[in-house]
Each structure stands twice: as structure tokens, then as C-alpha cells.
Amino acid sequence: MIKQRTLKRIVQATGVGLHTGKKVTLTLRPAPANTGVIYRRTDLNPPVDFPADAKSVRDTMLCTCLVNEHDVRISTVEHLNAALAGLGIDNIIVEVDAPEIPIMDGSAAPFVYLLLDAGIDELNCAKKFVRIKETVRVEDGDKWAEFKPYNGFSLDFTIDFNHPAIDASTQRYTLNFSADAFMRQISRARTFGFMRDIEYLQSRGLCLGGSFDCAIVVDDYRVLNEDGLRFEDEFVRHKMLDAIGDLFMCGHNIIGAFTAYKSGHALNNKLLQAVLAKQEAWEYVTFEDDAKLPMAFRAPSMVLA
């Protein structure tokens, strides 16, 4: 039987909030089977929980937020959510003493390291996957995203940025997903932004944690970071990282083929909601026979060590 996963122990880290620029303490806690992914703000009294749920997602100019019925929100969840998807973590309590998850280096890699440091535990309960049964597509002008049936999890993402630093040959990336492929090829790709936008936002008291330490920063001509890029196609890899996190907002790994053109958080979420709203387009599946599990979700020994 393919089992649900949680953490072996509690781990903690500190970072800076992208919005406030203030120190944030992040605590990751194991959770029992069928808990799901829960984000918790401990800076509020009493603490407020935000279960990962496609319908709770709000896209802002700077990040993805989860918002509850009282309009209380927790921000910048997308990169940690991608790390949870990448390692197939089904049950976890994510606590922060702030309104946002720390931005860390702008990628998912610090969260992957933290999760691996905690250790991954298998629970004696079947893991539920969402399997795509019919093609579902959403569009917004010339942007689009779709899911098709596929016995695995594949991603094909194209961006279209007219910028000298983003070469035409590096605007498309495809991935046959696995935990190992995610860690090696996707998790280290950082978010990116224009220097002029960061300066403008900071002049208005926003994006106070934005810096070269947590993003690729470009001007009109080049990448400004001294160390340059981690991958020549880091921009599109990061957009794929975002999509992996966005699509895991249903709390389950998805079995299907995802293709997107110029998509972002809002359109990724629109696709996920469109799939879930169409009952005949998907189903929950479990795997009693390990041999029937798609290769995409077979954990390498380093993950479950």
C-alpha cells in the first residue's frame, strides 16, 4: 500500500518576510493521517488555521495568499507548498509567528532541506491521489493552462518575456515529475522581479524584504545579481515551481499532464478549481499494489531514509 506521509519530528527555521521585512519563525510539525496541509498563524490570539484549499487562494501582485471567511490571510505560501508537493507530504502543520511564510532565498530549496532534515515518516493509511480523467482547459486572453489524463505527472510550461536577459531558447521547460527531478531541477529556481518595481513598492512600504538575497533582480537589460543565474532557464523553471505549488493546493498529488502558456498563480488556481468543479473530470485513487503506482511518485531512498 502507498502510504500517507508526514514528518518524523518538529523542525524550525527563521527567515525574513517579503512584505514586512521582519524576522519570521517557521515551525513545521508532524500531523496524523488525513489532517492534510494546514497553515497556522500563531501571531494571532487565538491562532488561526488555514487548510490548503483551492477555494481559499487569493493571488496578489506579490504572492499567493490563503484567506479565510473572516478575511484573515496568510501570505507567500507558494514556495513551501511546492516543496510539500515535491516530497509528497500529505499531513503537516505549518506555523508562523507572522502574517507570511518567510521568503528565504526565493526558491523552494531551503524548505526542501528543512523537510528532509525533519525526516519523512509513512503513516499506516492509504495516500489519496487526484487522477485526471478528462481534459480541462482554462484561458485568459492569450494565456492558457490545461490538464489531460496521463499515468504520471508531467509539466510543460512556456513563458513569453521580451527581455534581453531571457533568451528565446530558455522560455520553455518540460519535466517528467519525480521527487528527485523536483529537487535537482526545479526546487532551486528563484523568483524574479524588476529593480524598478521593487524600488517603487518599497517606496510605498511594500515588499520591504525584497533584496538580491531572495530573488533574481533584473533591470531593462540584464540580471543584476552578482552570482548570476543558477540555471540559464531559471525564469521558466521558477514558473514551473510556482505551478507545482499552486496545483498542490488541493492537498493531493495529481496524476495527469499539465501544460501551460504564460500562466501564473491566478490561472493555475483557476485550472485547479475548474478540474475539481467538474466531477467527471477527476477521481480519488489509492494504490494497494505498490507496483501500480506511477513512476513519478516512487520515492527515492534519500527521501524516506
Swiss-Prot record:
Kindly tell me the pathway this chain contributes to.
Glycolipid biosynthesis; lipid IV(A) biosynthesis; lipid IV(A) from (3R)-3-hydroxytetradecanoyl-[acyl-carrier-protein] and UDP-N-acetyl-alpha-D-glucosamine: step 2/6
Q: Where is the active site?
A: H265 (proton donor)
- Enzyme Commission number(s): 3.5.1.108
Record-linked SUPFAM superfamilies: Ribosomal protein S5 domain 2-like
Q: Which cofactor is recorded for it?
A: Zn(2+)
Q: Which cysteines are joined by disulfide bonds?
A: none
Query: Does this UniProt record's set of keywords contain Lipid biosynthesis?
Result: yes
Q: Does the keyword Zinc apply?
A: yes
Task: List, alphabetically, the InterPro entries matched.
Answer: Ribosomal_Su5_D2-typ_SF, UDP-acyl_GlcNac_deAcase, UDP-acyl_GlcNac_deAcase_C, UDP-acyl_N-AcGlcN_deAcase_N
Per UniProt, the keywords (alphabetical) are: Hydrolase, Lipid A biosynthesis, Lipid biosynthesis, Lipid metabolism, Metal-binding, Zinc
Please provide one cellular component term from the Gene Ontology annotations of this protein.
membrane
Question: GO biological process annotations for this chain's record?
Answer: lipid A biosynthetic process
Known catalysed reaction(s)? a UDP-3-O-[(3R)-3-hydroxyacyl]-N-acetyl-alpha-D-glucosamine + H2O = a UDP-3-O-[(3R)-3-hydroxyacyl]-alpha-D-glucosamine + acetate
Pfam families given for it?
LpxC (PF03331)
Citing just one GO molecular function, the answer is: UDP-3-O-acyl-N-acetylglucosamine deacetylase activity
The free-text function statement in the UniProt record for this protein reads:
Catalyzes the hydrolysis of UDP-3-O-myristoyl-N-acetylglucosamine to form UDP-3-O-myristoylglucosamine and acetate, the committed step in lipid A biosynthesis.
Family indicated by similarity: Belongs to the LpxC family.
Record's protein name: UDP-3-O-acyl-N-acetylglucosamine deacetylase
Species source reads: Klebsiella pneumoniae subsp. pneumoniae (strain ATCC 700721 / MGH 78578)
